[in-house]
């Protein structure tokens, strides 16, 4: 593995029991233009876990853990229970998602974002950034398998792949199922996310040592802009929501840079929000992609239990060149059992039928997307 750092030094305040790792005293960085393992690095839910509150409690604000002093519940609402993490955001007003916290494993704050990892009662380890769930150990596999296998299953023999984000390592884990791959570049802006992976997900971080992998610590949008033209067979954008710093990853200039970096007939897959909440955002993303990608432009979706509304979408686009039929996989990983390395666990979610079904949309979404 080669590691290239392009980050500038920033200060971090580790608060009350946070775990500095690998000599980091100046914490973590916000996923902007290249984020970690899951899509939704929501900006409007910040995480706050502070000891020293009166009665040993912490205030519940925008994606926080509330604690009990043994006598009463403390928070913004009587419905907030102690020992639970709750995720709030302006992107889904009027609703929230909560998980029971068994143990707080890590918490840090930098100039960019809050990073928190806790053990949940139902989904194993849960990573949050700025108070928004990025990935759950036992519930995030549908998102990861689909963001990798929808694009790579649609082209024969992918060799050179770029991952924007993916610092925990779930996306890389899935990608290593393909023996045809010769080079994987991972651009992760947050070095502490990588450190969290090394400490708490060593089975994932071990894959960073694969000789085909180059881990770049830096800005994903800048990396793509500077990339060699027609170099990659596939680019996977595992980004946060299109607000704040990640907004650039959903705009036309970024898609133009991606298209330039892809070979003719190359493919890109990026997370593209929920059809239940964000049709206005999805329509704008599709409009940008249709202006840029001259091959095909498609929207797919899948179910993820710990994301808002329980679903997440993907944009799948190809550049002009050899035709790409995303809806009928030519390289389905579930059919090629010889491609699965012995050290990798079997697929939990993806199969050829799920691949095809991902492009079948409800009538209301189809009519809006096709209009």
UniProtKB/Swiss-Prot annotation:
Annotated S-adenosyl-L-methionine binding sites: 113, 188, 219-220, 307
Keyword Disulfide bond: no
Positions of region (Disordered): 1-70
Pathway where it operates: Alkaloid biosynthesis; nicotine biosynthesis
GO molecular function: putrescine N-methyltransferase activity; spermidine synthase activity
Catalytic-site annotation from UniProt: 238 (proton acceptor)
Annotated keywords: Alkaloid metabolism, Methyltransferase, Polyamine biosynthesis, S-adenosyl-L-methionine, Transferase
Transferase as UniProt keyword: yes
Domain (PABS) ranges: 82-319
Enzyme Commission code(s) on record: 2.1.1.53
InterPro entries the UniProt entry points to: PABS, PABS_CS, Putrescine_N-MeTfrase, SAM-dependent_MTases_sf, Spermi_synthase, Spermidine_synt_N, Spermidine_synt_N_sf
Induction summary: Triggered by jasmonic acid (MeJA); this induction is repressed by 2-chloroethylphosphonic acid (ethephon), an ethylene precursor, that can by alleviated by 1-methylcyclopropene (1-MCP), a competitive inhibitor of ethylene receptors. Accumulates upon wounding and feeding by the specialist herbivore Manduca sexta; these induction is dramatically amplified by a pretreatment with 1-MCP.
Tissues and organs where the protein is expressed, per its UniProt entry: Mainly expressed in roots.
One GO BP annotation of this record: response to jasmonic acid
Function: Involved in the biosynthesis of pyridine alkaloid natural products, leading mainly to the production of anabasine, anatabine, nicotine and nornicotine, effective deterrents against herbivores with antiparasitic and pesticide properties (neurotoxins); nornicotine serves as the precursor in the synthesis of the carcinogen compound N'-nitrosonornicotine (NNN). Methyltransferase that mediates the conversion of putrescine to N-methylputrescine.
Family of the protein in this entry: Belongs to the class I-like SAM-binding methyltransferase superfamily. Spermidine/spermine synthase family.
PANTHER family listed in its UniProt record: PUTRESCINE N-METHYLTRANSFERASE 1, SPERMIDINE/SPERMINE SYNTHASE
Name of this chain's protein: Putrescine N-methyltransferase 2
Gene name of the record: PMT2
């Amino acid at each position: 593995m080669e590691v290239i750092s392009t980050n500038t030094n920033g200060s971090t305040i580790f608060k009350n029991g946070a775990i500095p790792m690998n000599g980091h005293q100046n914490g973590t960085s916000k996923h902007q233009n290249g984020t970690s393992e899951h899509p939704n690095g929501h900006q409007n839910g910040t995480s706050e876990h502070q000891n020293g509150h009166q009665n040993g409690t912490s205030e519940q604000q925008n994606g926080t853990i509330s604690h009990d002093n043994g006598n009463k519940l403390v928070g913004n609402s009587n419905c907030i229970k102690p020992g639970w993490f709750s995720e709030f955001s302006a992107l889904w007003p009027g609703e929230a998602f909560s998980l029971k916290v068994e143990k707080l494993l890590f918490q840090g704050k930098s100039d960019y974002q809050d990073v928190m990892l806790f053990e949940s009662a139902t989904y194993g380890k849960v990573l949050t950034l700025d108070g928004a769930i990025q990935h759950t150990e036992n519930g995030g596999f549908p998102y990861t398998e689909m963001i990798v296998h929808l694009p790579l299953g649609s082209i024969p023999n992918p060799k050179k792949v770029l991952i924007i984000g993916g610092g925990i390592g779930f996306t890389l884990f899935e990608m290593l199922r393909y023996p045809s791959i010769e080079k994987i570049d991972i651009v992760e802006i947050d070095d502490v996310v990588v450190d969290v992976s090394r400490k708490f997900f060593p089975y994932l971080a071990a894959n960073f040592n694969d000789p085909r992998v180059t881990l770049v610590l830096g800005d994903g949008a800048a990396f793509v802009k500077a990339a060699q033209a027609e170099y990659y067979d596939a680019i996977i954008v595992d980004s946060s929501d299109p607000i704040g710093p990640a907004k650039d990853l959903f705009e036309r200039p970024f898609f133009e840079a991606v298209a330039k970096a892809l070979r003719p007939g190359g493919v890109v897959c990026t997370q593209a929000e929920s059809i239940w909440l964000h049709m206005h955002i999805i329509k704008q993303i599709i409009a940008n992609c249709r202006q840029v990608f001259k091959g095909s432009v498609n929207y797919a979706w899948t179910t993820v239990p710990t994301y808002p509304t329980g679903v997440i979408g993907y944009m799948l686009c190809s550049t002009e060149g050899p035709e790409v039929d995303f809806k009928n996989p030519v390289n389905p990983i579930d059919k090629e059992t010889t491609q699965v390395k012995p050290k990798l666990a079997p697929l939990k979610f993806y199969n050829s039928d799920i691949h095809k079904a991902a492009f079948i949309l409800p009538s209301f979404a189809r009519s809006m997307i096709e209009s």
